[in-house]
UniProtKB/Swiss-Prot annotation:
Belongs to the HemG family. Binds 1 FMN non-covalently per subunit. It comes from the Bacteria. Residues 3-172 form the Flavodoxin-like domain. FMN binds at residues 9-13, 84-152. This is Protoporphyrinogen IX dehydrogenase [quinone]. The gene is hemG. Catalyzes the 6-electron oxidation of protoporphyrinogen IX to form protoporphyrin IX; under anaerobic conditions uses menaquinone as an electron acceptor, under aerobic condition uses ubiquinone as an electron acceptor. Pfam families: Flavodoxin_5. It catalyses: protoporphyrinogen IX + 3 a menaquinone = protoporphyrin IX + 3 a menaquinol; protoporphyrinogen IX + 3 a ubiquinone = protoporphyrin IX + 3 a ubiquinol; protoporphyrinogen IX + 3 a quinone = protoporphyrin IX + 3 a quinol. One of its GO terms (cellular component) is plasma membrane. It is a peripheral membrane protein. HAMAP family: HemG. Gene3D superfamilies: 3.40.50.360.
Length: 181
């Protein structure tokens, strides 16, 4: 069994989550290729039993390359077991960590031609020292308005790694379902 994990990241946390998922899956005997969606050519879909795509939010939007990829390959994505994870800082609040309660994930899923079998909303990381001055200022303003961390000397990882491990187990279950057909 082999899994394709594609990610769209801006500051690296979505890639970290993709790598963690691959490690968890490997521990379950499932091999995974982790690929940056921004650098990916068309996947060899037939080489994989399922696909997972992760995408991060910046200033309220997913990267356009992610949106275009999903539109271009929706038929392929819908034709195999698939999962989606959204990474954003709103999800640092536990009540905003489901596709139903997270507005970014909900809007994407409602408008997307892709219908993943399983979805997760995962909190990202706040990495002020790594941001350009403009991003640091804007993100600080957003965090102040939403009651988040505003100390620009800090890096805070909000990702709940046990939630990511649970997501990996759900992904493994998707593979088992598809092989039972």
């Amino acid at each position: 069994m082999k899994t394709l994990i594609l990610f769209s990241t801006r500051d690296g946390q979505t890639r970290e989550i993709a790598s963690y998922l691959a490690s968890e899956l490997k521990d379950m005997g499932i091999w995974a290729d982790v690929v940056n969606l921004h650098r990916a050519e068309e996947p060899d879909w037939d080489s994989y039993d399922r696909v997972v795509i992760g995408a991060s939010i910046r200033y309220g939007h997913y990267h356009s390359a992610f949106q275009e990829f999903v539109k271009k390959y929706a038929t392929r994505l819908n034709g195999m077991p698939s999962a989606f994870y959204s990474v954003n800082l709103v999800a640092r609040k536990a009540e905003k960590r489901t596709p139903q309660t997270n507005s970014y994930a909900r809007k994407f899923l409602m408008s997307s031609p892709w219908r993943p079998d399983y979805c997760a909303v995962i909190a990202g990381a706040l990495r002020y020292p790594r941001y350009r001055w403009y991003d640091r200022l804007m993100i600080k303003l957003i965090m102040k308005m939403s009651g988040g961390e505003t100390d620009t000397s800090k890096e805070v990882v909000y990702t709940d790694w046990e939630q990511v491990a649970h997501f990996a187990r759900e992904i493994a279950h998707l593979t088992n379902k598809s092989s039972a057909k």
